[in-house]
Structure formats: C-alpha cells, structure tokens
Amino acid sequence: MYPSSHSLTSLTDRSGLLFGADYNPEQWPAETWPEDIRLMQEAGINLVTVGVFSWALLEPREGTRNFGWLDRVLDLLHDGGIRVCLATPTASPPAWLGHEYPETLPVDADGRTLWYGSRNQFNPSSAKYRQAAAAITESLAKRYAGHPAVAMWHVGNELGQVSYDDETALAFRGWLTRRYATLEGLNRAWGTSFWSQGYGSWDEVLPPRRAPYLVNPSQTLDFQRFTSDQLLSLYRAERDIIRRYDTASPVTTNLMGFFRGADYFAFARETDVVANDWYTDPADPDSHRFGSLTHDLCRGLSGGTPWLLIESATSGVNWREHNVPKQPGELRIDAFSAIARGADGVCFFQFRQSRFGAERFHSAVVPLAGEHTRVFREVADLGKDLQTLRQLAGTPSTARIAVLFDWDSWWAAESPDTPTNRLEVLDQLQAYYAPLHSSGLAVEVVHPSADLGRFALVLAPSLFLLSKEHADGLGAYVRGGGHLVVGPFSAVADDNGHLAPGRFPCVLADLLGVDGEEWVPLAAPVGVVFGDAPAGQARIWAEDLALNSGTAEVVAHFGGGRLEGRPAVVRNQTGAGHSWYVGADLPPLALEQVVADALESAGIAYPLAAPLPDQVEAASRGGHLFLINHSGQPQEVEPGWASVDLLTGGAHGERLTLPPFGALVLKEPAPQELSNLKNHRTRGTA
C-alpha cells in the first residue's frame, strides 16, 4: 500500500463529509455546464467523479487526444469550489479499439465474442487492451496531475470482467506455472487422476470452458483466483502510472460489495481509499439490512478507517426487473446508514439523468424534470444534513465483533458438485448477521487471516475452504480467551478444494469438540430443540455429529427423523475461550439463541435498553448513536438515556418515536456512563 497520508483525510479536512455524484458533462451541451455548477452548489455537492465513460471522446481515433472539453470542465468545477475525482475511462473502450483489435474483446465460456455497443467490452488479459489503457491513463495523469480541481483518482469502473479466450489461456498457464512450478504439481493440485484429466503439456491447460458435464472444481477455483488477480493487476498498472505524476492524491477504484468476481480483501490492500457502490432495493424490506452488512464489509476492508460510498441511487435504478423508486425520506436514511458505519462521504450515480443510452431511466440528482422536484429537494436537504454532521468526518468506526468472510471459500463452496446448491454463502452470512444488526451491535467483516485478538466475538457463518494456517489462527484466538461461532459445512476443504479424509470439520474438529460422518441435505424440515424447548426447524441442511471431547456439551439437538437426539449445536471450551459449532441451517429464533449465548459468554452488552423494532437500525460513530427507521410507520425506540439530536438540536428522553423513514443522531453519554448503562442490560431486556 501507499503511505497512510493517501486517504480521505486529505479531502475531508477541508470539506467535512464528502457529498457528490458521477458527473458526465459529455452527455450535455457545453451551455449546460455552468448551470450544472450552480445546481451542485445549491445541493451542497463538494466532489464529483468525472470521465468514467469518456474514452471515445478523449481518444476519438487511436493516438489522437481531445482534452479541450475536459480542460474546460475541470476549470469550471474548480472555479465553482467543486473537487474532482478524476477517472481513467478504461472500463468502456471505444469502438475503434474492438474493431481494429478484436483480441481486446472478451470471449465467454461458450467461445462467443462479446462485442462493443455496451460497456465493459474488454479482455483483462489482452496485451493490446492493456497497452491502450496505459496510454490513455498516462495522457490523463501527465496533463491533470497538479490541476487544482483534482483531489482523487478513480481507476476504471467496477472491475469484474472475465474472458476465456486463447490469450487468457496463455496468461492462465503463466499464473499456474508461478503457483505450482511443474505439471506434476498442477496435476496433484487439481486431482486430475479423476476422470482421466491428467495434463502432459502446459499447452493442454485451458480456462474452464463449456464442457459436456461438470468441470473440475479445482480448475474452476484457480481460474476464479487468476481472474481476480488479473483484474487487480489492471488496477495496479493504472495506479502506478498515475503515481508517477501525482504522488499526493489518493487513488482508488469502485468496489461492488459482495461481488463474486474479485477478491476485495486483495483489492483493499492496494487502494488508498476503500470506495464502494451500494444500491438499496426499495422493493425489498430487508434490503437495508444487507446494505448494513455491505457497509460493515467496507468497515472491515478499510480496517476501521473511513471509507467512501462512491455510488448509490437517489431513487429508482434501471437494471432490476421492476424498478421501484425510493419513498420520500429513503434517500436520506440510506445515506445516514453508510455514514453511521464509517463512510466519510456519499455519492450518487449520476448528477443529471440521461436522455439517451441504456441507463436513461436511472434516477439522478437532477431528474429530467429539473431542480423543482422531490428528488433534488431531498438531495439538497441531505447536503445540509451532512454539513451538520461534518464533525464525524475522520472518526474511526471499529467493532468488538467480527464476521469472517473469504472469497476463496465462497468460490469453492458454491461449486455445482456439492451436496446442495441451496446452502448459499451469502444467505448464511446474512442469517448470522441478522441478530447482531437487530441488537444494534457493531460488526466488522474481516478475512480469516485478520488479527482477531481485538475482537471479543468472532462468527464464521460459512468457511467451506479453510487452510490449516487459518484454522491454527482460530485455535490460538479461542485458547487466548476468544469466542468463536462456526456455521455448517465449514472446514470441509483445503486450499485446492480437496476434501480431507476422516471426520469433518477436519482442521477444526478438535477445537470445536465435535466431528461428523455424514452431511444430510434435508428432504423434509427437521425440528431443533434447546433442552426441552422447540426452536423451529432446519429446512435445508443437517449434519450427523458426535461429541469428541469431554469439555464439549450439546446446546441443541435435532427433534425428529433419522437424526433424532443427535447434536445440532455444540459448545466447547478450549483454553480460556469458548466455541460453538452449528450443524444445521438454524431458523432465526434458534440462531438468535446461539448468538445470545455467545454474546453473554464474550461479555458483550447490548447497546440499547430494549430490542429494536424490526425495521429500525442503530449504529454508533464518533460518540453519536444513529437511529434509523427504514419503515413507513412510526417506530418506538428505547435507547435508555436522554439526549439531544445533532441534526435538529431537539431533546429526546429515554424512550422516543422515530417518524416514518426518519432518523435521529443522538449524542451518547460519556464512555464510562454508557459502559455502566450497557453492563446492566441483560438478554431478557435488550
């Protein structure tokens, strides 16, 4: 990584919280641009991303540069007090590149070329594409490094392309050679003795193209790793060019939360600022919860330092099957959710709604109907709110609870040859996150290799693939006094996706005090019982488990079918810590009981005096508690102390009412007073 001085602090020290949008002036006549600046100022916008999709305008023919329009735009923005996140336009190559050099175009697993006429039409392994991308990036960096408007750089856009062409096959072989050194090493890692798949020459090795039946899962896993590395190398190449000309401004690229196509833990180590896209689905009442989880991933990716919500929607999008607009007030509370969970800025796609192109129906800061609209008024009101909250800029956002997540494990777990395709990783992640979110507890989503010592409780909802190194780290964490909850179908495979011989969960069996002999995808739901109290049913998954340690105890058992009386949840003590293994897809009530037991054992108090209503979110940052109502109904909340709302100055008692789609930002009591309040709260009252 580059020095920590390359961070959002260089922007927020001057502007407070960042507020902005993607600005695409090339879609509009130049006469519109001064009016755009006026509207930005009226809305309180202080940062815009420029140039994301402008390659064809910047380089209309190979080697020809057209910078006049961009010179004027940057000068206008600077004169208007608007800072710029200048993008390299390499996400959408011009038609001439694909026409003259078809090898730059991606090829799908069926061998079909994906043509220009859309966006993202590039092959990450194409040498010609990389050459052209480097050339336009260097031209931009050389010309605009030091321009007073440019405060940050944005590489490409939503890097996620994949190709299966011959040039990619060559690059894949090089990646495999560096990983395994020899064909013998590759054949062992891929288990090619199965189905007569052994390779006798590197020229025979291909990406996992369309095949008659299931493709080798180890080959597929390595290709996903390779593709992620190729995308990261694209980012690095452009970043390093920019750095030659601008050593001061932060460089980033926009991530997409839980996007399956790239390992964002690897990306986060290379970016100066973690920047993420998040688009709430107004039609889904639980979308805000997944949004919170995504923000907590950003909190983990950034190590608790501020991050940036670089894309979101003011209202409806255009790419879902049914694009419901946001209700009045939703724009504001969605932004607050990100700020509460560590974001130092909120930006929208895009500034002006397009009249043409594939995203013409996507909402924007300025709708086609103009400034005298609900959406623009709400944006301007949010701009004022963010100025009121400017004291939160730069404040850290850390947690005592970690949720473990690993892209390698995700890729491996959802191979089509597993016992079920219904036990999806993100579903498991959300299920374990839900009781923490509903209690207002702060969470960081981190990699299994993270320093876990700063967390009192660690949840691992799904770690299908777990290396011995990471398993040893979890063991050391528990023995040292940590508390660990492990979800089903974990510690099943090694780094190559090979299953371990013996009883599962393999490298965690001794730590967890339990092992199993058979996975049991369920033909019918089976009950889960805590003591004598039924707690719902597992519907997808169960495991045939047995205790293997005198320190292990059965917390819950199965209540029916062939697994009647067998352990469903096991708790074990190892050293100074405790672990829980969950051998089923527990229903919400049962999982809530397991998490509550772990919280109590870890000494983590509930932050509020009473449980939160279902559609209310609570999160703390910078000594302030954000209370956010994601429903269209008033909601009663009981923080347990009297306080003042930072947004309005209004006083509130120990119990309060949140208006529909409303929010409060309450000053929290002094740390010791707050700690005393929390320590008196029990599970029954929280």
Model regions and ranges:
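Short, well-ordered coil/turn segments that N-cap beta-strands
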Residues: S15-L17, G44-N46, H78-V84, G146-A151, ...
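Conserved, mostly hydrophobic/aromatic
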Residues: A21, M40, V48, L77, ...
